[in-house]
């Protein structure tokens, strides 16, 4: 596997192999080996609820534990210890022979903000807006503005196209085509759904 350089990223975009829409400022967004992505204007945070824990086997919809915030003018403030979901402003589509990773920008990380907790890997065949799992591990609240560059996507070639890429009918591709912050669909995992635990 090899990481795409800026010239290869531009070529893949020009040839329609990678979709990044909108890519409003390619000169600023395309870096030597990545593309800076911006945060959208919709955020989800956990409500304070009276439950001992989130249990994947509980039939309650995890969505009901979340509150949605739309930010048009001004920032979304994330406080120390808080967790929120958002999406990239850009819609991304990958071919069947590329994978991608999302990493936080160092300028954001130096404020104590992480952009993904564990889900930084994007499978071949994915298309949609990427859900960001944002945490403030610092000691001060931080303002995040819609369309602010907060993360970067790195593309890697595969040795061959995936036989069953993300979105294939035989896969449980729970997040294909997402356009809004998507809460966990862990209850749809095979082992949970079929009481294998």
Swiss-Prot record:
**E.C. number(s) listed in UniProt:** 3.5.4.30
Question: What are the site positions for Important for bifunctional activity?
Answer: 120-121
Key word Iron present in the record?
Answer: no
Which CDD domains did the record assign? Answer: trimeric_dUTPase
Name the active site residues. Answer: 133 (proton donor/acceptor)
Renumbered to this chain, region (Disordered) spans 161-183
Pathway where this protein functions: Pyrimidine metabolism; dUMP biosynthesis; dUMP from dCTP: step 1/1
Q: Name one Pfam family in it.
A: DCD
Q: Which reaction does it catalyse?
A: dCTP + 2 H2O = dUMP + NH4(+) + diphosphate
InterPro entries, A to Z: dCTP_deaminase, dUTPase-like_sf, dUTPase_trimeric
UniProt KW keywords:
Hydrolase, Nucleotide metabolism, Nucleotide-binding
Kindly list the GO molecular function terms attached to this UniProt entry. dCTP deaminase (dUMP-forming) activity; dCTP deaminase activity; nucleotide binding
Q: Which residues bind dCTP?
A: 105-110, 123, 131-133, 152, 166, 174, 178
Instruction: Give GO BP annotations, semicolon-separated.
Output: dUMP biosynthetic process; dUTP biosynthetic process; nucleobase-containing small molecule interconversion
* Bias (Basic and acidic residues): 165-174
Family per similarity comment: Belongs to the dCTP deaminase family.
Q: How does it assemble?
A: Homotrimer.
**Described function:** Bifunctional enzyme that catalyzes both the deamination of dCTP to dUTP and the hydrolysis of dUTP to dUMP without releasing the toxic dUTP intermediate.
Query: What protein is this chain from?
Result: dCTP deaminase, dUMP-forming
Q: Which organism is it from?
A: Methanothermobacter thermautotrophicus (strain ATCC 29096 / DSM 1053 / JCM 10044 / NBRC 100330 / Delta H) (Methanobacterium thermoautotrophicum)
């Amino acid at each position: 596997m090899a990481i795409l350089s800026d010239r290869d990223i531009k070529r893949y975009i020009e040839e329609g192999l990678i979709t990044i829409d909108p890519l409003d400022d390619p000169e600023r967004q395309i870096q030597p080996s990545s593309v800076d992505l911006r945060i959208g204007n919709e955020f989800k945070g956990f409500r304070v609820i009276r439950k001992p824990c989130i249990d994947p086997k509980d039939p309650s919809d995890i969505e009901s534990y979340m509150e949605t915030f739309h930010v048009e003018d001004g920032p979304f403030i994330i406080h120390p210890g808080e967790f929120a979901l958002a999406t990239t402003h850009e819609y991304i589509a990958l071919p069947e022979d590329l994978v991608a990773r999302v990493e936080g920008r160092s300028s954001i990380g130096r404020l104590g903000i992480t952009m993904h907790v564990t889900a930084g890997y994007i499978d071949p065949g994915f298309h949609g807006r990427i859900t960001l799992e944002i945490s403030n591990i610092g000691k001060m609240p931080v303002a995040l503005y819609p369309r602010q560059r907060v993360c970067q996507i790195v593309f890697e070639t595969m040795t061959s196209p995936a036989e069953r890429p993300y979105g294939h009918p035989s896969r449980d591709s729970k997040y294909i085509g997402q356009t809004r912050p998507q809460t966990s669909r862990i209850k749809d995992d095979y082992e949970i759904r079929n009481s294998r635990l």
